[in-house]
Amino acid sequence: KAWAFNGQADMTDKPLLSVRAGQTVRIRMNNRSRWPHGMHLHGHHFRQMLLEEQMGPLRDTLLMQPGEISEIAFVADNPGDWLLHCHMVEHAAAGMMTWLKVT
């Protein structure tokens, strides 16, 4: 597989994160590739963390440019198992997908 989250390609039995409903979650992503990635989170809307702890608009997809490091934040208010993946189908099929558990 060509893509990974925390060194793990494809869906695993263990979620990237397991959080309780109501928790604030922050996920830092680093695009170490030469390609853009439309990172999409199911089940929640998030805000991109900007300079000086400011937050961007609500969204469910963030386009990350090559070499970009970004952090998203959201309140985990929707219990379930939620997919986080690159919205470019070839990238997701090549391993750029994981999941979050909200209990």
Question: What does each model-found stretch correspond to?
Answer:
Residues 1-37, 43-55, 59, 63, ...:
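Edge beta-strand plus adjacent loop/short-helix module at the start
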Residues 22-24, 81, 95:
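Generic structural microfeature
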Residues 56, 78-81:
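Short, glycine/acidic-rich beta->alpha junctions
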Residues 62-66, 94-103:
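Extracytoplasmic/periplasmic copper-protein system
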Residues 72-78:
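Short, hydrophobic beta-strand segments
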Residues 78, 88-92:
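A short, acidic, flexible beta-alpha connecting loop/helix-capping segment that sits on the rim
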